[in-house]
UniProtKB/Swiss-Prot annotation:
Presence of keyword Cytoplasm: yes
Record-given protein name: tRNA uridine 5-carboxymethylaminomethyl modification enzyme MnmG
Oligomeric and partner information: Homodimer. Heterotetramer of two MnmE and two MnmG subunits.
Keyword presence, Repressor: no
Physiological role: NAD-binding protein involved in the addition of a carboxymethylaminomethyl (cmnm) group at the wobble position (U34) of certain tRNAs, forming tRNA-cmnm(5)s(2)U34.
Length: 597
């Protein structure tokens, strides 16, 4: 029976990137989804990027992924967040037209031979401990050498409006009813997680004159260097909760399925519902909310920061307690969704199941929260699924390589007991792993892995040769008694001013000029982080043999032995990041390894 090399289950942000990456390697790919028209839809906020997330998108772009292209093409408002802070944490956020984003994502996917199939996957097809493909609810069998599960919130999904619930993966769409049982049968541990989304408000019912306007930046930012035609088109707005908002929530917590104990799933710590904010931060008089347009021609605005699972009739009162929303009409109510997710410590660093070779997973099913986290995992899972189908070894991104490396290392090495969100604070080498140098860091890997053509690498290498040449020129240049580099390191000085006084032989692009300025001004910090990276690599070089009997390692604490036995780290670096493993345990393990364990 003819089949596929890779079958991707789900058409969200993880599934899109998985199918796109797998197809880059020339294998036969099928993407199975209940509704192909909804591929790439954004069920929550209509935006891409933000702190920690824009860095992920930049790395996805560098690795040949499609999210950055789709976001730029659909952009209607862009801003760089944390602009007043250092380059390590500056983060682009791109507001998009929700429908246009999905359309552009589907158009990009169609550039590669991915077969899109309508259907619900009911089970993995496994015989004799081997993965043979998937079976669908309507009785089809789809043979495949590898499968990527990217089911988002659909695995046994339940949506909640107050104390009332119904099976759904998200509003108006049925859940994946059977796949969870198949994953359990393979040996995976499933947990219940929860997330939520705010209400959508009819735009003509909002008094925008009472809101604070946030204009788009001009010129607009972009992930790919090619801003879309509408990237500086629309503003966003801000409002705040009031004393009445908080009172309505506190007086009606018994109607919340979370506080009433109906929802067993664990919600995201860093994206809490408005109920959680009011309860957890009782000392705050108000909470900032962002009012975002859903698109260029939509009649809806999105109330970011106001996700809720309270009943619809109460949401009406809550929304109308906000300045500018006194006459607001809710088009779609907020709701919570509860779903199954895997324990990611049961995966390899290539996002492959430890129980069933050829089975990969990505996105919220791995315990993460957010489009960007899903896309990053999808790309890695799709790449490795294709490599598995071709008989090639798994590849992964080490922690020191960037944000995707940290994301996967945290998930697989430490696990998560709540929906995981990427933040800049999680990344030890964030000054080395900036969004602006993702191309330098990851394009060589993308080309080596078959995700991008060699001419892309040649362009990137030429760019950084020009940067290096300009840094050498500035080192030799004398300005006011010091070298050009020393002059540029003064806080009040800029490369633009220096280049106007002492022009380079060939003008640099804005991106190249930015690289010169960052590398000059932060040279000392960059050198410090490079030394830290070398230490991390030294620990990574300490490989731990497969099947090591940790309880027999002399000097290892009982807790460390238990944790190491559970997580099975492959290196001393991985062992160091496991909670409960102390420095003394690492020393004992290193001594044991040096003795030829």
């Amino acid at each position: 029976m003819a089949g596929y090399d890779v079958v991707v289950v789900g058409g969200g942000h993880a599934g899109l990137e998985a199918a796109w990456a797998a197809a880059a390697l020339g294998v036969r790919v099928a993407l199975v989804t209940v509704n192909p028209d909804r591929i790439g839809m954004m069920p929550c906020n209509p935006a891409v990027g933000g702190p920690g997330k824009s860095q992920l998108v930049a790395e996805v772009v560098a690795l040949g992924g499609l999210m950055g292209r789709a976001a730029d093409a659909a952009a209607i408002h862009t801003r760089v967040l944390n602009r007043s802070k250092g380059p390590a944490v500056q983060s682009l956020r791109v507001q998009v037209d929700r429908d246009l984003y999905a359309l552009k994502a589907q158009e990009i996917l169609a550039e590669r031979p991915v077969e899109v199939l309508r259907g619900e996957v009911a089970a993995l097809w496994v015989e004799g401990g081997r993965l043979l493909g998937v079976r669908t609810v309507d009785g089809r069998t789809l043979p495949a050498k590898a499968v990527v599960v990217a089911g988002g919130t659909f695995l046994s999904g339940v949506v909640w409006y107050g104390r009332k619930s119904r099976p759904a993966g998200r509003q108006g769409e049925p859940p994946a009813r059977f796949l969870s049982q198949s994953l359990k049968a393979v040996g995976h541990t499933l947990r219940r997680f929860k997330t939520g989304t705010p209400p959508r408000i009819r735009a003509d019912s909002v008094d925008f004159g009472r809101l604070e306007v946030v204009p788009p930046e001009v010129p607009p930012g972009s992930f790919t260097g090619n801003p879309g035609p509408h990237a500086a088109r629309l503003p966003t707005w801000q409002t705040r909760t009031t004393e009445r908002t908080h009172r309505l929530i506190l007086e009606n917590l018994h109607l919340s399925p979370l506080y009433a104990g109906d929802i067993q799933g664990i919600g995201p710590r860093y994206c809490p519902s408005i109920e959680d904010k009011v309860v957890r931060f009782a000392d705050k008089e108000s909470h900032l909310l962002f009012v975002e347009p859903d698109g260029l021609s939509t009649t809806e605005v999105y109330l970011q920061g106001f996700s809720s699972s309270l009943p619809p009739e109460l949401q009406e009162e809550m929304v109308r307690s906000l300045p500018g929303f006194e006459r607001a009409v809710i088009q779609r109510y907020a709701y919570a969704v509860e779903y199954d997710s895997l324990d990611p410590t049961e995966l390899t660093r290539g996002l492959q199941s430890r129980f069933l070779p050829g089975l990969f997973s990505a996105g919220q099913v791995n315990g993460t929260s957010g489009y960007e986290e899903a896309a990053a995992q999808g790309l890695l899972a799709g790449l490795n699924a294709a490599r598995f189908a071709l008989g090639l070894p798994e590849v992964h991104l080490p922690r020191e390589s960037g944000y995707i490396g940290v994301l996967v290392d945290d998930l697989v090495g430490r696990g998560t007991d709540e929906p995981y969100r990427m933040m800049t604070s999680r990344v030890e080498l964030r000054l080395l792993c900036r969004a602006d140098n993702a191309d330098e860091r990851l394009t060589p890997l993308a080309v080596a892995w078959g995700l991008r053509p060699r001419e892309d690498l040649e362009r990137v290498e030429a760019k950084y040769r020009r940067v290096a040449a300009e840094l050498r020129r500035l080192e030799a240049l004398r300005v006011e008694g010091v070298s050009g580099l020393q002059w540029l390191r003064r806080p009040e000085n800029t490369y633009r001013a220096l280049a106007e006084r002492f022009p380079p032989p060939e003008p640099l692009s804005p991106e190249e000029a930015y690289q010169v300025e960052v590398r000059a001004k932060y040279a000392g910090y960059i050198e410090r982080q490079e030394r830290l990276r070398e230490k991390m690599r030294d620990l990574e070089a300490f490989r731990i043999p497969e099947g090591m009997d940790f309880p027999k390692v002399p000097g290892l604490s009982r807790e460390a032995a238990e944790k190491l036995s559970r997580h099975r780290p492959k290196s001393l670096a991985e062992a160091a990041r496991i909670p409960g493993v102390r420095d003394s345990d690492l020393t004992a393990l290193a001594v044991h390894l040096r003795r030829g364990a």
